[in-house]
Amino acid sequence: ATSQGEILRANINFDYRFCPLNTHFFWAEFKLNFGFDTLKDEALKNARSNQPSGASFGSIFKNPKNDFAGRLIEAVGLKGFSKGDAMLSDKHANFLINKKNASFEDAFFLIELARKKVFEEFGTNLENEVIII
């Protein structure tokens, strides 16, 4: 880091789901290139085609090695399951949806229910995609 607390991208080795800076970011500055990459746009559209739109917590769990969290959650019968206004998406079971006014308690209940049922059925411990503080 510089004397002003700045860290350059070249000094950070980001990887898929890994940031060596185990901390929170309060500010970032990005340099953007002008233009449009149609290949990246198509890849993004394909990736999002099976994901729900609207208010979403996003992916709940990381995919376990050699499997998919969404497949496991669906296999235990929780795809589309709701508690209050929180719902495990009926489009992709690893997405948590806020139907209107979901509470933290309802969302957390669904996260723990999915983790418990998947472990009971498959012996797989699902790891959170996000950190709950």
Model-derived segments and spans:
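DPxDG-like acidic metal-binding loop motif
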Residues: 1
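Phosphate/pyrophosphate- and phosphate-bearing ligand-binding catalytic cores of soluble enzymes
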Residues: 4-109, 113-116, 121-133
